[in-house]
Amino acid sequence: MSGGPVPVWKKYTTRPQGIWEKIRQLLVLVPNRSSGNPLVSLFRQVPPGERIKEAQNYKDPVTIPAGDIKGNPYFKRDYRRNYPQVHTFNQTKISGLLNLGSESNPRISIGEKGNKELAVFTNGQDVSLASTLKSVPASVVKGEVLGKSGEPIVAPSLNKFKWEILPEPVHGMYSEAYPCRIFTEKKVRSQSSA
């Protein structure tokens, strides 16, 4: 402790009383050192094992609705096995999208006529995609399926930039014999995209 040695009478340990304390101070090497035996009245109040009744009356806290089993089955809470659900598109669904459009670009009629058009694709009958491609207007095929002039749609290039490898005279750190490359700090546009 800072502030110098603590006198024995300030420590929470047992010590001799009266003349025995004076004899102890004469005989020991360090009189200010305590015996190390804690005072029973001041040590670990409440002692361990004292509150057995409180421990027996303990009730596990339950949070509602998370702890409620009804309406909260395990398979809904099981995030370890919550894999993405696989959805497929068959020829009937694709034919329906081509004929009736999508939510962003609908071509379906309003009202009862629209329900009849939709029933063709939802009643479980298989619709051939080849016959649908023949029957849909050319603007759908050349605009949504293919490009505007009938060319196939190509995915955009992900290599929009390339890194330039600096030669040894530019970076001046390693010779060409050392197998270490240094790249530019900025991306340089490739000639094809420029």
From Swiss-Prot:
It comes from the Eukaryota. Disulfide bonds: none annotated. One of its GO terms (molecular function) is oxidoreductase activity. GO terms for cellular component: membrane; mitochondrion. GO terms for biological process: mitochondrial respiratory chain complex I assembly; mitotic cell cycle; regulation of cell size. Fungal-specific subunit of the mitochondrial membrane respiratory chain NADH dehydrogenase (Complex I). Complex I functions in the transfer of electrons from NADH to the respiratory chain. The immediate electron acceptor for the enzyme is believed to be ubiquinone. Plays a role in cell wall integrity and is involved in osmotic and oxidative resistance, yeast to hypha transition, and virulence via providing the ability to damage and invade host cells such as oral epithelial cells. This is NADH-ubiquinone oxidoreductase subunit NUO2. Keywords: NAD, Oxidoreductase, Translocase, Ubiquinone, Virulence. Disruption phenotype: Reduces mitochondrial NADH dehydrogenase activity. Leads to growth defects on glycerol and oleic acid, and shows reduced oxygen consumption rates. Decreases the mitochondrial membrane potential. Shortens the chronological life span (CLS). Leads to sensitivity to both cell wall-damaging agents calcofluor white and Congo red, as well as to thermosensitivity. Also increases the sensitivity to oxidative stress agents H(2)O(2) and menadione, as well as to osmotic stress agent KCl. Impairs the yeast to hypha transition.
